[in-house]
């Protein structure tokens, strides 16, 4: 994406319909609601992806799993939503914190740039968030995701193990205890109060951060690239395809009657632009970071000591399938990420612009 064009001075880096700036509460709540909706709706994609990626942790005699086989193992439809609670907690809290951190970084940097040069135009036609350069989008997304990703790492591991069928946790307590102890025999003892009345010794809180490096190696580049491509699609490419209603009306004499199918009012146009940009950006970045996701899942499901990204990578490449193992579950992740991004970013962008949110929190 090119640098923001120069134009007449713009007094506000971020403005709403009331001329005020959304505070942190608005971004936090809008992000949390967006994350909550997408997490509950798309949990089946995450569950099936996790089970496809865990396959080589089972015995070597087992037949290679497929999506069809995993679906047949499910006895009830609601089993597809196993792990929804930790997933919802992770996504809603994570999305709220991420959107808040990202918006604060972007607006603060935008205000700093305008304090140096008031002629810079940072206004976006479809969003109240400032329009930055490609490198600034990449950097802010990378840093914001790194901070929030590490904070929410314990919930991420609980979510991953709930989705797996290697750990049959029946409650959040069992999940937290099992990860803390990280020993299957001790996990079984916890489930039987007559054997063990509580969490015994030998546990470690470090277990809640297993796979942190792989997770951040996946999420930070993903987030940085995502913000970069999302802003590029939103501000530069898609507006060329979806015309502005005022532009269409002014040139209506030269347009055929069929062109009216592609004319949208400002609110609908911004929603379509934001959702389309989110889906395209998510699909691009998901494919690029797929190997890190496969490694992260394997690390968080194994109990082996001294596991590292390099060790797991070599092991996965030696297994049947070779390099294809690094892209196991990609189609499910593409589907989930694409739809999730379309839902969450559209909801987020529209909520922070809505009159209701403005009247309540501004």
UniProtKB/Swiss-Prot annotation:
The chain crosses the membrane at residues 28-53, 83-109, 138-163, 211-234, 273-299, 329-347. It catalyses: glycine(in) = glycine(out). This is Mitochondrial glycine transporter. Mitochondrial glycine transporter that imports glycine into the mitochondrial matrix. Plays an important role in providing glycine for the first enzymatic step in heme biosynthesis, the condensation of glycine with succinyl-CoA to produce 5-aminolevulinate (ALA) in the mitochondrial matrix. It comes from Candida albicans (strain SC5314 / ATCC MYA-2876). One of its GO terms (biological process) is glycine import into mitochondrion. Solcar repeats lie at residues 22-108, 132-236, 269-354. One of its GO terms (cellular component) is mitochondrial inner membrane. Disulfide bonds: none annotated.
């Amino acid at each position: 994406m090119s640098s923001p064009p120069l134009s007449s001075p713009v007094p506000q880096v971020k403005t709403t319909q009331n001329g005020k700036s959304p505070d942190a509460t608005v971004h936090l709540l809008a992000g949390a609601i967006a994350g909550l909706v997408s997490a509950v709706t798309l949990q089946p994609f995450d569950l099936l992806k996790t089970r496809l990626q865990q396959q080589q942790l089972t015995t070597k005699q087992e037949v290679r799993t497929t999506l069809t086989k995993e679906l047949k193992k499910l006895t009830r439809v609601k089993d597809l939503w196993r792990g929804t609670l930790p997933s919802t907690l992770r996504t809603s809290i994570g999305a709220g914190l991420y959107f808040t951190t990202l918006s604060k970084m972007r607006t603060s940097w935008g205000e700093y740039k305008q304090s140096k040069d008031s002629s810079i135009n940072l206004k976006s036609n479809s969003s109240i968030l400032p329009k930055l350069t490609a490198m600034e989008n990449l950097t802010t997304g990378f840093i914001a995701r790194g901070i929030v990703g590490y904070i929410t790492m314990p919930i991420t591991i609980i979510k991953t193990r709930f989705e797996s069928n290697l750990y049959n946790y029946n409650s959040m307590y069992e999940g937290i205890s099992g990860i803390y102890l990280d020993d299957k025999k001790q996990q079984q003892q916890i489930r039987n109060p007559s054997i063990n009345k509580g969490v015994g010794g030998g546990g470690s809180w470090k277990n809640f951060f297993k796979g942190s490096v792989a997770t951040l190696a996946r999420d930070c580049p993903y987030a940085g690239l995502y913000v970069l491509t999302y802003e590029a699609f939103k501000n530069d490419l898609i507006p060329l395809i979806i015309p502005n209603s005022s532009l269409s009306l002014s040139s209506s004499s030269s347009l055929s009657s069929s062109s009216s199918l592609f004319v949208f009012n400002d609110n609908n146009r911004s929603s379509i632009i934001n959702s389309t940009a989110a889906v395209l950006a998510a699909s691009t970045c998901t494919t690029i970071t797929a190997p890190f996701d496969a490694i992260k899942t394997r690390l968080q499901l194994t109990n082996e000591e001294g596991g590292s990204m390099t060790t797991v990578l070599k092991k996965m490449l030696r297994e049947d399938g070779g390099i294809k193992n690094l892209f196991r579950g990609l189609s499910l992740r593409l589907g989930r990420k694409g739809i999730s991004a379309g839902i969450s970013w559209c909801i987020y962008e529209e909520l922070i612009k809505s009159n209701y949110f403005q009247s309540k929190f501004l």
